[in-house]
Amino acid sequence: MLKKCLPLLLLCTAPVFAKPVLTVYTYDSFAADWGPGPVVKKAFEADCNCELKLVALEDGVSLLNRLRMEGKNSKADVVLGLDNNLLDAASKTGLFAKSGVAADAVNVPGGWNNDTFVPFDYGYFAFVYDKNKLKNPPQSLKELVESDQNWRVIYQDPRTSTPGLGLLLWMQKVYGDDAPQAWQKLAKKTVTVTKGWSEAYGLFLKGESDLVLSYTTSPAYHILEEKKDNYAAANFSEGHYLQVEVAARTAASKQPELAQKFLQFMVSPAFQNAIPTGNWMYPVANVTLPAGFEKLTKPATTLEFTPAEVAAQRQAWISEWQRAVSR
């Protein structure tokens, strides 16, 4: 009788010892073997007595699209990889809960006062090029767009990618009502528009373009990991558009306490030290930057719309872009 009951007893008691799983939706380059994801996973699991499950999607806008589709049935406990340009749209979904993280725990340009979304890094959009191949890079966004130079350009889709959305807003800041004409000119130099950052940067490294939309911090990877200094970010006279990447916990999470603990962990040194050489962005906490970051392009001017401005105009500007590049 005891032998018959033993398997049943084990089945009944096994869940008691199973570790809880915290599911984090993020973008592919964060979760990749070469991204900060593995380091973050190891550090958090060492402290939480849980399993951290990273679910990778193509890019930041795709995260919001996926969450909208899944709604309250989403398996995500935390969404990591939205940004300052999606704050208003993300808030209006009603799918996120307050973070419990103090605003003064983070340090980003312009400050931070949102009680739902927590920054984990920041950076500036830029066009990266190979100095060995491009001797006279554009000195401004207008030069990139309007020059007679036959530069080959790759950027990301603003409907699926946060860098792509960043370029959309950057163009709008510089050109205003003339943005559609600027997009038409840039289209003549555009090799392709990708869904996400990883694909675009990979094509650039294969020699498919002269310039690729990325970040002022991207050359740090080549400097530190490859010991190469031939990649640089073009420094544009109009300034560079700021991106602050954020995470938030979902209101429907089955692990609300773990999700809140993860957000607190996100602004700690254990997470933040993985950002400069894992995500190749600037950390939001006071951690030491590695040697090599001092060589990076430093924008003289920071460009940014408010989240409300982006929310009010984003769809209209995307429609303008679609019409312009399809002509």
Swiss-Prot record:
Top-level taxonomic group: Bacteria
Ways its activity is controlled: Transport is inhibited by the sulfhydryl-specific modifier N-ethylmaleimide.
Keywords of this entry: Periplasm, Signal, Transport
Residues where thiamine binds: 59-60, 161-162, 197, 215-218
Gene3D superfamilies: Periplasmic binding protein-like II
InterPro entries registered for this protein in UniProt: SBP, SBP_1_CS, ThiB, ThiB-like
The UniProt record lists the keyword Transcription: no
The family this protein is said to belong to: Belongs to the bacterial solute-binding protein 1 family.
Subunit structure and binding partners: Monomer in solution. The complex is composed of two ATP-binding proteins (ThiQ), two transmembrane proteins (ThiP) and a solute-binding protein (ThiB).
Listed name of the protein: Thiamine-binding periplasmic protein
Organism the protein comes from: Escherichia coli (strain K12)
Gene expressing this chain: thiB
